[in-house]
Amino acid sequence: MRLPQDIIIKPYITEKSNMEIGAGKYTFIVDVKSTKTEIKKAVEALFSVKVLQVNTMNFEGKVKRTGVHEGPRPAWKKAVVKIDTDPKPVEYLAKGGKTVTNNKKYKTSIEEFGVAQ
């Protein structure tokens, strides 16, 4: 099993990704072999947030030239993670018909991005 630090490589900061932070969407560069489930678990473990949705995109490496030599840049994967910005308590019925409320404390933003909601 891989560590969350091995799956999430770094945040992907662009003008578009900064605008999406207000909607609770954060963008990361992730390991090429990672799956959506692994990305979700890694973000929840690293940042203590509740992940609602993960969208991934694969990018092929471009061929670049240096003088007469040609070589490919490495392929990479981008993940857009939507977190729960308004966590609601979960109510369910326990044995005996009692209603139990589960108030898990999750963060509503990722402060490491430097943008507060």
UniProtKB/Swiss-Prot annotation:
GO terms for molecular function: rRNA binding; structural constituent of ribosome. InterPro entries: Nucleotide-bd_a/b_plait_sf, Ribosomal_uL23-like, Ribosomal_uL23/eL15/eS24_sf. One of its GO terms (cellular component) is ribonucleoprotein complex. One of its GO terms (biological process) is translation. Keywords: Ribonucleoprotein, Ribosomal protein, RNA-binding, rRNA-binding. The keyword rRNA-binding applies. It comes from the Bacteria. It holds the Pfam family Ribosomal_L23. One of the early assembly proteins it binds 23S rRNA. One of the proteins that surrounds the polypeptide exit tunnel on the outside of the ribosome. Forms the main docking site for trigger factor binding to the ribosome. Belongs to the universal ribosomal protein uL23 family. NCBIfam families: PRK05738.2-4 (NF004363). Part of the 50S ribosomal subunit. Contacts protein L29, and trigger factor when it is bound to the ribosome. This is Large ribosomal subunit protein uL23.
